[in-house]
């Protein structure tokens, strides 16, 4: 299976999540978490930090990432590794290819016409919120 990652970034108040607006397929024009491919010979953790930095400018000094869960998509032969982190300080975002936007956590995450992932995004965010509330 091809290894991919998603990085879910919360602001310090934990009331907003960072999204990119996809510039290409799949999900072109929709909000999605940042992330990308795990390169050959690269650790999963290093790949998550690399993708986060490349796409947002957020580095290891700004956030501590934790591997949260994996989703396997057998039809596409993808192993999607979900990482989560809360910013430790204010950061200035640096956009790579996709526009970046902070989105308030509310029921708007359920809009399938706005968010990628066929309703996976609100499920992932809710599971992470429960996890963080119980002490990450």
Predicted features and spans:
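A conserved beta-turn-beta hairpin within the catalytic core of GNAT-like acetyltransferases
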Residues: 26-29
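The catalytic Nudix box helix
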Residues: 33-67
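A generic structural signal for short hydrophobic patches within well-formed alpha-helices
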Residues: 108-112
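Glycine-centered loop/turn positions within well-structured domains
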Residues: 15-16, 54, 89
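Active-site-adjacent beta-strand/loop module that shapes the phosphate/pyrophosphate-binding cleft
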Residues: 3, 69-106, 118, 123-135
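Conserved N-terminal beta-strand and adjoining loop/helix that marks the start
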Residues: 1-18, 34-37
């Amino acid at each position: 299976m091809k290894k991919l990652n998603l990085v879910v970034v919360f602001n310090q108040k934990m009331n907003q999540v960072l999204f990119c607006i996809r510039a290409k397929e799949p999900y072109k024009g929709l909000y999605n978490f940042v992330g990308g491919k795990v390169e050959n010979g690269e650790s999963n953790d290093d790949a998550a930090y690399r993708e986060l930095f490349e796409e947002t400018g957020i580095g290891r000094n700004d956030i501590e990432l934790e591997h949260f869960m994996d989703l396997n998509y057998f039809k596409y032969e993808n192993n999607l590794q979900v990482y989560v982190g809360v910013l430790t300080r204010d950061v200035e975002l640096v956009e790579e290819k996709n526009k970046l936007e902070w989105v308030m956590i509310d029921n708007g995450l359920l809009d399938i016409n706005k968010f990628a992932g066929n309703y996976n995004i609100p499920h992932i965010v809710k599971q992470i919120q429960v996890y963080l509330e119980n002490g990450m």
